[in-house]
Amino acid sequence: MTYLSRILEEKRQAVLALKQQRPLQHYLEQETELSPCRDFQGCLKRSVDRIKLIAEIKKASPSRGLIVSDFKPLEMARRYMDLGASAFSVLTEEVFFQGSPDYLKEVRRAFSLPVLRKDFILDECQIFESRLMGADAILLIVAALDPHQLQDYLDLARQTGLHVLVEVHDHRELDIALNAGSMIIGINNRDLRDFSVNLHTSIKLRPYIPEGIVSVSESGVKTAADAALLDNASFDAVLIGEGLHVSEDLKRVIWTET
C-alpha cells in the first residue's frame, strides 16, 4: 500500500465521521455570515525579479515522523513573515501530519497573509468546512480525485469564494488540471506513492503551464540553490515547509514581500 492510499483510506473514514457529526445543512446555514477570502492567487503572482514564498506550517510528515517537537504555529508563522512570505500553508490533516484546524484558525486570526488549508479534500463537505474554518484557499490533489470530482469541487470552491491550488505530479495530471480550468497549478516534486522527491519534476512540467496561470513548485526545496533553480525556471511561487525550519541556507534567502 502506498503512502497516498493509506492516507486516503484513513481520510475517507474521517470524512464519514465528519458528515455524521455535521450534515451539509450545518455548513450551508452558516455560509452567509462569512467575510471575503484574502487574495491567495493575486499574492502569488510573480514579481519582476523574484519568486514568491508560500511558507508551510507543518509539525510532522508520514515519511519523517515528528519534524518540530516544540511546535508553536504562531511563532513559526511570525518567523516566516520576517523572511518575506507572501502566504501561509497550514497542515490540518491530523493523523499522518499531526495538523489541526485550530492551527489554521490561530494563524488566520493573527496575521494578514492569505492561508492555504493543506489537507486531503475528498468530499464537498470539506470545502464548506474549509471556508468556515477561515481558509482563503484549499488544495485539490489530482491523484486523489477523478476528473469529474476535480471539476465539481473546483467549481464549488470558487462559488464559496475560496481560491484553489490544484496539485499535479506528471503530464497526465497537469492536462486534467488544465482541462478543469485550474488557475493555480502546484507541481509536487514529491511522489505521493512513495514520498521520494525529485526537484526536476517541476523543471520538466513548468513549460507546459500556460501564461496567466499561477505556477507553484512544491516540496523538496532544501537550499538557496534549489530556490534559485525554480526562480530561474520562472515559477511564480515556491511552497516550502521543512526546509525553512531546518536549513540555515534557506533562512538567508531574501523573499519578495507582498
From Swiss-Prot:
PROSITE patterns for the chain: IGPS
InterPro entries tied to this protein: Aldolase_TIM (IPR013785), Indole-3-glycerol_P_synth (IPR045186), Indole-3-glycerol_P_synth_dom (IPR013798), Indole-3-GlycerolPSynthase_CS (IPR001468), RibuloseP-bd_barrel (IPR011060)
Biological or metabolic pathway of the protein: Amino-acid biosynthesis; L-tryptophan biosynthesis; L-tryptophan from chorismate: step 4/5
EC code: 4.1.1.48
GO BP term, pick one: L-tryptophan biosynthetic process
Catalytic activity: 1-(2-carboxyphenylamino)-1-deoxy-D-ribulose 5-phosphate + H(+) = (1S,2R)-1-C-(indol-3-yl)glycerol 3-phosphate + CO2 + H2O
Alphabetically ordered keywords of this record: Amino-acid biosynthesis, Aromatic amino acid biosynthesis, Decarboxylase, Lyase, Tryptophan biosynthesis
Organism superkingdom: Bacteria
Presence of the UniProt keyword Zinc-finger in the record: no
Keyword hit for Lyase: yes
Gene Ontology terms, MF aspect: indole-3-glycerol-phosphate synthase activity; phosphoribosylanthranilate isomerase activity
Stored Pfam families: IGPS (PF00218)
Residue ranges the record marks as coiled coil: none
Family named by the database record: Belongs to the TrpC family.
Protein name, per record: Indole-3-glycerol phosphate synthase
